[in-house]
Amino acid sequence: MKRKLIAAMETCGFKEGQTLLLHGTLNPEAAYPDTFATFWTDDVPDGVHFDNVTGSYDWAFSVIIYSNDPKIVNTKKDEVRAALKAAGFIPQGKGQDAPSDEQTHTGWAMDFVITEYLI
């Protein structure tokens, strides 16, 4: 499911390892890219069960967009939400402001769930 999330984010212009990063992996010594996104797997609980066998997993992801241009944050979030929704991810609301470690950047965080069916 991470690969699916990454592929959907790449349709929005993010590049894995450059402007799309696992949350917490940005080099603290490096300058922030002008615009970038991070993601994190929040949880992957069992979904359904049948005869003591797990039939699905519900993947929960957080995606955070950061930019030094607030206009980009305010428009890119809609593009990302639409791309992830088209890829099968279910938005959990519209999101919320996200703090940044750099005063030059603002952020927007969104949560998504997608079910992985095993049977």
Where are the predicted features?
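Small/polar-rich, solvent-exposed N-terminal microdomains that initiate assembly or binding
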Residues: 1-50, 71
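Short C-terminal domain-edge/linker segments immediately following a structured domain
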Residues: 52-53, 67-73, 92-98
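Short, low-complexity, polar/charged sequence segments that are solvent-exposed and flexible
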Residues: 40-43, 56-60, 82-86, 112-113
